[in-house]
Amino acid sequence: MITHLQGRLVEKTPTYLVIDCNGVGYWVNISLHTFSQLSDTQQLKIYTYLQIKEDAHTLFGFFDKFEREIFSLLISVSGVGANTARVMLSSLSPAQLQSAIVNSDVRTIQSVKGIGAKTAQRIILDLKEKMVKLTSDNASLVAASQSPSSKEEALAALEV
């Protein structure tokens, strides 16, 4: 699997981007969420998911690892393909989507074009526990990153 691409942004549209990595241009499908998060800087790093089918190899790109994780979970649901997952991440942010699944909010998920009641219920049924676990994992990572380091604690103690 190609986990990320780092290089020069050649072209950016709401549905795809082209990134030049050492002379090789990669066409990467993106969501509107990723499009809105990317600045027009020349250099960028994009996290990827490579879908391999018998007729095509398709790269999907994400602004961060969290969005890629949500995408991977969505495509694990029967009846949700990569393009449907991309449309879902274009309509709702990863955090909104996660919240809707954790809170069993069928209406929010159904608001995405192409998602009916049965598919929304299947997504909630299949992913609710995984999303709760993902939430607790992310919360512990955020808490750990926000706790002061030993150096910061030592400097704070010296200031007093």
Positions of PLM-derived features:
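A short amphipathic alpha-helix within small helical-bundle interaction modules
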Residues: L74, L89, L97-I101, I109-Q110, ...
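Small-residue (primarily alanine) positions within well-ordered alpha-helices
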Residues: A85, A120, A154-A157
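A positional/architectural concept
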Residues: M1-S76
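Amphipathic, charged-and-aliphatic alpha-helical interface segments
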Residues: H57-G61, A82-I101, R122-T135
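Short acidic alpha-helix initiation/capping motifs at coil-to-helix transition points
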Residues: D64-F66, S99-V102, Q146-E152
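Glycine- and Gly-Pro-enriched alpha-helical subdomains that act as flexible
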Residues: Q110-K113, I123
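Strongly charged, low-complexity linkers/loops
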Residues: L125-V160
